[in-house]
């Protein structure tokens, strides 16, 4: 890996892309520290300091925004609306015939879907921005802070509209920066910005664990968290690299005097075919009842029950519900994103076949059977990765940000980026033979 990064800076084209990507990342981090107009930044900082190390309903969104959400900055929503819009469009592609047709039209259809994703991102940003501003003005963003109601001194409608439009424009800017990285930089822009956002919160979270530790000056807690984190990173790397390769053989054809086909390839089916999406789905679904309870009367029985069972991530009821939702969404997402019949049809049209399996429907059934067997350990792995840090680090200040979701995203994005860098290095190494 170190030699690959050295090779990047020796290749002019890759060096230019790397510098461009780093420049965009710097702009993104700068925007994450620009406060929204009408926000009392000093008051926000006092409330954030009091809330540091405690759990929160918006914890996942705050981590995805690099801490900008609770800071109420220009990029407070971060890349989350874009992620949500992309997932929604991906799901709708399966059930909306028009979108499915666009998906099959190649680059032109994909461009149209990208345009729809942008529109949906802006719409979601308006809704989420309105919710953020309303939460901040009511003081519910920092329920434990006594001065939370003074975060937004100006309570006029005009001030609220300006704040919502500003945070929506910030989301559109983040989306533009992500697409710039994808088009002119290295790696996937959306994934890299998530990577940067999560990585930026880790040093502060680790230091909070050390500061609030009670044994050996907090160094024992700090070392335990680091050790568990390293073990989980190794586990994620091992599982994310694991795949089942379905062999595909293409028959040899004679066209004139030339022979075509006769090659062998494979279909890579990953153990974790669903990625991190099931964890995001499960987290979002569990946040809804807790968020409703937060805005309701605290003396009501059902609100107290939800707060008691759903706010703390180490509560047994929460753990069981979270785990079952992750397993369910893992199977659900794999079922709608991997169309075994379509893959089998494409193989058949290209003159290929899986050795020992008849082409057509038997191949589709075989692919579905293998994928279901892979999804079971993959879903259990996702559930364990998401829950082990939450349960193991319960009671450690700042450790609520060191979630399995964060580790999973950081490792996955890192592996994918390194693969793309190696691919581009190999491509440049063959340029001399192609001239």
Where are these regions (language model features)?
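N-terminal cationic and glycine-rich segments that engage phosphates or anionic surfaces
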Residues: 1-103, 108-435
């Amino acid at each position: 890996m170190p030699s690959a990064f050295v090779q990047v800076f020796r290749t002019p084209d890759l060096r230019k892309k790397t510098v461009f990507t780093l420049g965009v990342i710097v702009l993104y981090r700068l925007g994450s520290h620009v406060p929204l107009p009408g926000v009392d930044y000093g008051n926000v900082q006092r409330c954030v300091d009091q809330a540091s190390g405690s759990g929160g309903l918006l914890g996942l969104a705050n981590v995805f925004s690099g801490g900008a959400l609770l800071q109420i900055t220009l990029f407070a929503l971060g890349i989350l609306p874009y992620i949500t819009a992309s997932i929604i469009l991906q799901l709708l592609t399966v059930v909306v015939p028009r979108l499915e047709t666009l998906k099959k039209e190649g680059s032109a259809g994909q461009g149209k879907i990208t345009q729809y994703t942008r529109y949906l991102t802006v719409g979601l940003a308006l809704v989420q921005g309105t919710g953020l501003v309303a939460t901040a003005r009511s003081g519910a963003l920092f329920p434990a802070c006594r001065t939370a109601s003074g975060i937004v001194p100006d309570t006029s409608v005009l001030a609220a509209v300006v704040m919502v439009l500003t945070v929506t424009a910030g989301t559109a800017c983040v989306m533009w920066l992500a697409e710039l990285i994808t088009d002119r930089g290295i790696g996937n822009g959306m994934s890299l910005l998530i990577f940067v956002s999560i990585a930026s919160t880790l040093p502060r979270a680790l230091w909070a664990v050390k500061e609030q530790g009670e044994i050996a000056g907090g160094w024992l807690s700090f070392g335990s968290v680091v050790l568990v984190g390293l073990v989980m990173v190794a586990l994620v790397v091992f599982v994310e690299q694991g795949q089942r390769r379905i062999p595909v053989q293409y028959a040899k054809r004679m066209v004139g005097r030339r022979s075509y086909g006769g090659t062998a390839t494979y279909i890579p089916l990953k153990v974790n075919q669903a990625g991190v999406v099931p964890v995001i789905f499960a987290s979002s679904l569990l946040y809804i009842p807790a968020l409703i309870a937060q805005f309701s009367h605290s003396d009501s029985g059902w609100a107290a029950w939800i707060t008691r069972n759903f706010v703390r991530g180490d509560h047994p009821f929460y753990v069981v519900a979270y785990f079952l939702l992750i397993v369910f969404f893992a199977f659900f997402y794999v079922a709608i994103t991997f169309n075994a019949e379509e893959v089998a049809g494409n193989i058949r049209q290209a003159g290929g076949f899986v050795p020992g399996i008849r082409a057509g429907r038997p191949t589709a059934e075989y692919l579905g059977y293998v994928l279901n067997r892979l999804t079971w350990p993959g879903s259990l792995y996702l559930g364990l990765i998401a829950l082990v840090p939450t349960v193991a680090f319960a009671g450690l200040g700042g450790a609520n940000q060191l979630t399995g979701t964060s580790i999973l995203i950081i490792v996955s994005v890192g592996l994918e980026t390194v693969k793309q860098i190696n691919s581009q290095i190999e491509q440049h190494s063959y340029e001399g033979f192609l001239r």
